[in-house]
């Protein structure tokens, strides 16, 4: 099934812009630049951008509902554009993947990610592709909430900027061809 919607998860507001939890927004921002997308338009509780890739129209979205209520925006986006969950890829941060790693999956559980839990609750299925971007776990017994809501260190920023570039290439393959085709490329760790 063709991908027609890419949703990056994050929190709106300047104070969250460069935080680990906003890596989904960062990927959308890079994809917007790469595709010279038009927008943002305010639709379906989101900032929406419209682009074409390989002759296909694609919607890029950043929910403005805050992470833990992302499902409301995703539900509205699917309704607004009359899409099935399988026609969407959700991009988000993952504590359980080391920094510098990413994983494209066609379906699965939330893995404890509250934004993804919200999406599953609102749309009633786990059957949608997702691109998980590794942010790693805190080195010390730091509070996880504090960790995900803090910015990357300068060393981490160098790594994450490369991962975001790879994520854009990965998503472009998934849109142009298919998520199944893109999985081998996206899940290789030697390309960043």
Curated annotation (Swiss-Prot):
Q: What is its main location?
A: cytoplasm
Q: Which CDD domains match?
A: PTH
Where is this protein found?
Answer: Cytoplasm
The record's GO molecular-function terms, alphabetically, read:
peptidyl-tRNA hydrolase activity; tRNA binding
GO terms for CC? cytoplasm
Q: Where does tRNA bind?
A: 16, 66, 68
> GO BP, one example?
protein quality control for misfolded or incompletely synthesized proteins
The record's section on Pfam families has:
Pept_tRNA_hydro
- Family statement drawn from the similarity comment of this UniProt entry: Belongs to the PTH family.
Q: What is this protein called?
A: Peptidyl-tRNA hydrolase
What is the species of this protein?
Answer: Aquifex aeolicus (strain VF5)
């Amino acid at each position: 099934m063709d991908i027609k919607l890419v949703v990056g998860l994050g929190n709106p507001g300047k104070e969250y812009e460069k935080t680990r939890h906003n890596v989904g927004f960062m990927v959308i921002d890079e994809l917007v630049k790469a595709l010279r997308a038009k927008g943002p338009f305010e639709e379906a509780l989101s900032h929406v951008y419209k682009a074409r890739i390989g002759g296909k129209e694609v919607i890029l979205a950043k929910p403005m509902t805050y992470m833990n209520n992302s499902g409301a925006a995703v539900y509205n986006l699917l309704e607004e554009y009359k899409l099935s969950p399988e026609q969407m890829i959700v991009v988000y941060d993952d504590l359980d993947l080391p920094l510098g790693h990413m994983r494209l999956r066609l379906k699965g559980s939330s893995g404890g990610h509250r934004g993804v839990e919200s999406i599953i609750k609102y749309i009633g299925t786990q059957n949608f592709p997702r691109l998980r971007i590794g942010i790693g776990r805190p080195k010390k017994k730091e509070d996880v909430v504090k960790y995900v809501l803090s910015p990357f260190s300068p060393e981490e920023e160098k790594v994450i900027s490369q991962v975001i570039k790879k994520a854009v290439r990965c998503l472009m393959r998934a849109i142009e061809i298919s998520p199944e085709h893109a999985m081998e490329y996206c899940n290789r760790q030697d390309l960043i």
